[in-house]
Amino acid sequence: ERRANQLKEKGMDVIMHELLKLIEQVLDLGITSFDHADIYGNHTCEAYFGRALALKPELREKMELISKCGIKMATDYNPELDIKIYDYSTEYIIKQAETSLKNLGTDRLDLLLLHRLAPFFNPEEVAKAFDQLKSSGKVLNFGVSNFSPAQFDTLQSYLDMPLATNQVEISVSCLAHFEN
């Protein structure tokens, strides 16, 4: 079993070096924004990216790290859940931002997005979390993902800082955002 674990770890080292090469190639092409979310890859993608970045930490200054939060999936990460839920409480937003920072191995996120609008969304809770994360220097800018213009404006009215962006899903199979 010990040998199997050693081989597994050696394999992960190879994967992390390959991921680092990919990050460097992308940066060489002039692509500097890396868009993550706490839930991607069953909560593993940020940690893998962070492990690769730790091999060459000076690359951090050449990139913008983006993460999203607010969706809790029914996975091993949240064994208490039977269905996907949204959580935009002050505590959860801060907890997930801090988890992303830890997983990515950085002291700040350049941009934090709310992943999708929740049915029982409380903009005051979000504003409180954004204020705390901004004042602590943990997050430089904030935005949303897949909000309508009215929803964007509603949240903006509670904030003392401008929302930086509304990242919307658009593809051949998803054209709804062109309609509003």
Task: Identify what each model region corresponds to.
Residues 1, 36-38, 67-69, 113-116, ...:
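A cross-domain feature marking catalytic cores of carbohydrate-active enzymes
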Residues 117-180:
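Beta/alpha (TIM)-barrel catalytic core signal, keyed to glycine-rich beta->alpha loops juxtaposed to Asp/Glu
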